[in-house]
Amino acid sequence: MIGSRFIEGGGYKGLEKNTKSTLKNIINNLNNSEDSALAVYLSILFNNLLKFILSTNIRDLTSGFIVGKKRFFSSEMFNGFEYGEYFVFVVMKLLKNNLNVREVGYYCKPRKFGKSKTSSSLFRLIRLSYPYLKIAYKSRKELNDS
């Protein structure tokens, strides 16, 4: 089970799926936080790109929140990755093994304190996206070959 920001019951830093979030409310929530509106927008776009590359219905491939029975996971699924791209690998391994992967909504609140490691700059966002894209293309090839 994946915690997803992009399905019913989930939300993302000012944008709540179960409410009628106005653009004004979203911008206000982000302005009163330590989050970048650009990072939020790019995250949504990036998840859609990953979804397209992988031809999957999973909507939040950068969530990082996953729960399941221990027997379905191995340490190799989490080792040897640069940042959060392990999550794409884990989800695709589970799907390749014909396991039922479901998403449940969770709300990622706007950051009130501290700085994001991910969105400190546009360059960093772009640099961190490369390993995700690499593992997505590799996973797609593995799924097509099986």
Please report, for each region that a protein language model flagged, where it lies by residue.
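Acceptor/aglycone-binding surface of glycosyltransferases and processive sugar-polymer synthases
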Residues: 1-75, 113-120
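A general structural signal for well-ordered alpha-helical segments in protein cores
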Residues: 42-47, 87-91, 101, 129-130
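Residues at helix-coil transition
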Residues: 51-55, 96, 138
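Catalytic donor-sugar/metal-binding loop of nucleotide-sugar-dependent glycosyltransferases
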Residues: 56-57, 78-82, 91-109
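Conserved glycosyltransferase catalytic-site signature
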Residues: 61, 65-66, 84-91
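Terminal low-complexity segments of carbohydrate-biosynthetic enzymes
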Residues: 72, 98, 127-146
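Residue-level signal for the nucleotide or nucleotide-sugar donor/cofactor binding architecture
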Residues: 82-85, 120
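Post-His helix in hydrolase/transferase enzymes
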Residues: 120-128
